[in-house]
Amino acid sequence: MKKAFFILLATFMPFISLASEKGLDQKIDEAFKPFSDFVSSIVFFEVFEGAPFVIILLVCSALFFTLYFGFPNIRFFGKAINVVRGKYDHVDHSSAGNNDLAVDGDIKDTIADESKEGEVTHFQALATAVSGTVGNGNIAGVALAIALGGPGATFWMIVCGLLGMSSKFVECTLGVQYRDIGKDGTVYGGPMYYLSKGLKEKGFATLGKVTAVLFAIFCIGGSFGGGNAAQSNQATIVLKDLMGLSSTSAGAIIGIILALIIGVIIIGGIKRIASVTEKIVPFMAVMYLLACLYIIFTNFSFIDDAFSLIFTEAFNPKAIGVGGVIGVLLVGFKRAAFSNEAGAGSASIAHSAVKTKYSASEGLVALLEPFIDTVVICTMTALVIIIFNFGGESGKQQFQYGKVEVQEEFQAVELNKKLYKVEKEQIVVNADTIQKTNKGYPIESVATWEDSLGNEVSDRDTTFFIASAYAKINGVDYKKEGDSYIVGGEKHKDFKGKVMIDGKLYEGAGITTQAFS
């Protein structure tokens, strides 16, 4: 154990020194940006505006599996719960005449024998996989979806979660079916194995090897990014806000503490991970749901209004700022895909270690994950945020859906060098305006920006620009017809998904934290 701690500390020391130099996040951004941009341009290629190829692929695949297998998310829901409960664990040692243990014909190989090869139980595998999905997507992702697409995005998250149950069923069944078991009993499984073996069986051995290697590489990258960095980032933001930590080193300290805690757990392998998650995940989920239910029932008078908003805004052709029904649908699907990871393949790595000789039994267990993660927990989070936004009995909204109020400091400098100091000025930015201006600074009171040569500028990378349009800042005219003024400020920022609450800007988990507090 001591050796493990020293290894972790030695690993993090270079990064700590880098953080003091330039900022660790900035160094990482600069190093990975070219590669990230290249991969993003392919994976997130937009088939049409706001619809990345990868989201369409995941949702369409989930729909196909749902139809092909005859709605397994509905037909086998009860059986899945029974498998997790252990109802069929030792059926091979029981009497064939025991009706309670008989399979009713839905799926022939759904009965598990816990005495067979594997390392973890069905419940441990479920808890391990859920521990990787419940978190940032449910807390920050839901807030982002509502901030961007309004309450209607919640409905489409639920739809995506229900369809995703079928994807989880398929990928985790394949994970067990094509797993390898070492001489010491260690289980090796996941998309790396079923892509390689499965495609080889179909006569595409080379393609199988290539896709397996690519998945392994991207899975490692994803575990650093969306799997860990995004989670710890949101946790750090919330902790700093709640505890009033303003030190620049606070984030690094919190990150190192989290890394050490996780390191102690994962060094023990899948057995230790499973033994920890089977205790933590149920407690974590129950505590969060109880907190949600407390808020919901103490504001019970708003329940009907909240559900009404969710359903009506889901089909509102004039949904604010995101392109109507299709826009809201895409916002919901994007956040749900990140939240439950259905179709990503990562869950099958944990599920492949289960003690069973029947692959489909674990597929049934896995289909419960998107239901727990998206249909239950995400819906609870959404209700808390929507109810919070009603503003109590006053009925005044805490923030505007699809909009953000931004406070920034600007300076206007006349060409004869006469200086005008502009106090903090409140600017309302519409999400639709942000989309249309692309990288430009999306200020409604300024139509376009031009450089000193009169060329229109779309990305504010330099310090000063000439405002070519009429600008009224803080009630003072800084651009009159025929006059030239230089307006300076911070470089372009992406304000999509952020909201202003009590004069402070919040995003992601910060919005959810405000709703709870």
What are these regions (language model features)?
Residues 72-120, 141-146, 150-154, 158, ...:
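Flexible loop linkers connecting adjacent transmembrane helices
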Residues 92-93, 115-122, 150-159, 197, ...:
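Membrane-interface alpha-helices at helix entry/exit sites of multi-pass transporters
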Residues 3, 65, 69-82, 211, ...:
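Membrane-interface loop-to-helix entry segments
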Residues 2-32, 391-516:
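Low-complexity, proline/glycine-enriched hydrophobic segments characteristic of transmembrane helices
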Residues 2-131, 148-151:
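N-terminal alpha-helical transmembrane segments of multi-pass membrane transport
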Residues 267-278, 283-357, 369-370, 384-390:
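Membrane-embedded translocation segments of transport machinery
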Residues 65-66, 130-131, 160-185, 196-233, ...:
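Helix-loop-helix module between adjacent transmembrane segments
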Residues 97-145, 174, 183-198, 220, ...:
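Alpha-helical membrane segments and immediately flanking helix-loop junctions
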